[in-house]
């Protein structure tokens, strides 16, 4: 059974910024925040609070001998500077703490490895403090067990989304789209994205000629009668196509390179991140494919080869060389908005053809 882990957001900014951010956090599936419950006011929310307050759901005790409020989870916050601090955490945790909040200012990995190893066998949860999405990723992967929760100091919803990909809880709305046009368009430059991860059947990248209409392009884990499986690769599409990044912004496929991070999704929309090991741009015969989902129409230009596959609503794969008008494939689509350097601009008018 997989370990339950939480991304706990510690929002920064004014009350007005907070009022805007909290509903967004709920929409993204965040369940816990590190915040004084007083700042929630009388607003109804499902968000649970962690804070040095008896009104919080998870009460951070400020003194070791403080009275424990009934019916609440209780913990302590610790700053770790040496192994002595780690031993102190273990001693106090054994006295009945439900959780510990750990802040390590330098050499984060080794101290947290030691804390996880020592607290792993007791029922005290470990919440670690992070300041960047990259720190969130490291803390969730330490010793392959990771901490139970990461308190992430941010007021950026894009950073929250990026961190959720590292947690493995980010998801995208996927829907079936009907193929309405297929046409050979001659040669063009296409991009093969070789990741540093093994990709599973059903997984791929979101690719499209429009940022609001992206096709799920499957990886090459299946192979063909002429090629061996390459389960790390996605033959993504033409250089102009968009793909989504973990932070929610878009990149052109021509911008993807060694060290870039890309989103890997399955047909249900569950996302994880992968690091790019290599990006290959080569000239190949290309196909233009258009599809319609609801009132939106989008397209993609992909290589004309049997190893490029889309995913059907039933999970089956279909090669672009066998694709027909009327077939349905999985896409991520939404109403069109403008983009400025990859960032969504919600009020800008845009028409793409």
UniProtKB/Swiss-Prot annotation:
Species of the source: Nitrosopumilus maritimus (strain SCM1)
Gene Ontology BP annotations: amino acid biosynthetic process; aromatic amino acid family biosynthetic process
InterPro entries: DHQ_synth
Protein role: Catalyzes the oxidative deamination and cyclization of 2-amino-3,7-dideoxy-D-threo-hept-6-ulosonic acid (ADH) to yield 3-dehydroquinate (DHQ), which is fed into the canonical shikimic pathway of aromatic amino acid biosynthesis.
MF GO annotations: 3-dehydroquinate synthase activity; dehydroquinate synthase activity; NAD binding
Xref: Pfam families: DHQS
PANTHER family: 3-DEHYDROQUINATE SYNTHASE, PTHR33563
Protein name: 3-dehydroquinate synthase
Enzyme class: oxidoreductase
Claim: NAD is one of the keywords in the record: yes
Reaction(s) catalysed by this chain's protein: 2-amino-2,3,7-trideoxy-D-lyxo-hept-6-ulosonate + NAD(+) + H2O = 3-dehydroquinate + NH4(+) + NADH + H(+)
Sorted UniProt keywords: Amino-acid biosynthesis, Aromatic amino acid biosynthesis, NAD, Oxidoreductase
Family to which the UniProt record says this protein belongs: Belongs to the archaeal-type DHQ synthase family.
EC number per UniProt: 1.4.1.24
Source taxon at top rank: Archaea
């Amino acid at each position: 059974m997989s370990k339950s882990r939480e991304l706990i957001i510690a929002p920064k900014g004014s009350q007005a910024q907070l009022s805007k951010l909290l509903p967004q956090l709920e929409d993204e599936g965040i369940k816990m925040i590190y915040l004084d419950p007083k700042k929630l006011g009388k607003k109804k929310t499902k968000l649970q609070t962690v804070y040095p307050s008896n009104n919080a759901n998870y009460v951070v005790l400020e003194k070791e001998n403080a009275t424990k409020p009934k019916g609440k989870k209780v913990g302590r916050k610790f700053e770790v500077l040496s192994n002595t601090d780690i031993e102190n955490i273990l001693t106090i945790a054994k006295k009945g703490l439900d959780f510990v909040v750990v802040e390590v200012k330098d050499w984060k990995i080794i101290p947290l490895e030691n804390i996880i190893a020592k607290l792993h066998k007791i029922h005290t949860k470990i919440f670690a403090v992070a300041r960047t999405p990259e720190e969130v990723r490291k803390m969730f992967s330490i010793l392959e067990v990771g901490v139970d929760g990461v308190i992430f100091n941010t007021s950026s919803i894009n950073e929250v989304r990026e961190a959720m990909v590292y947690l493995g809880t980010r998801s995208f709305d996927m829907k079936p789209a009907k193929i309405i046009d297929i046409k050979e368009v001659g040669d063009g430059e296409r991009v093969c994205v070789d990741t540093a991860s093994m990709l599973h059947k059903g997984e791929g990248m979101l690719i499209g000629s429009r940022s609001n209409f992206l096709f799920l392009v499957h990886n090459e884990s299946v192979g063909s009668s002429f090629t061996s499986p390459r389960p790390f690769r996605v033959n993504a599409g033409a250089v102009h196509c968009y793909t989504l990044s973990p932070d929610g912004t878009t990149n052109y496929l021509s911008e993807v390179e060694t060290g870039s991070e890309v989103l890997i999704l399955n047909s249900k929309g569950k996302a994880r991140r992968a690091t790019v090991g290599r990006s290959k741009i080569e000239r190949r015969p290309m196909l233009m494919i258009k599809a319609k989902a609801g009132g939106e129409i989008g397209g993609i230009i992909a290589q004309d080869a049997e190893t490029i596959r889309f995913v059907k609503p039933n999970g089956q794969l279909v090669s672009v060389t066998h694709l027909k008008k009327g077939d349905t494939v999985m896409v991520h689509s939404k109403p069109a908005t403008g983009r400025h350097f990859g960032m969504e601009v919600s009020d800008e008018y845009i028409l793409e053809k």
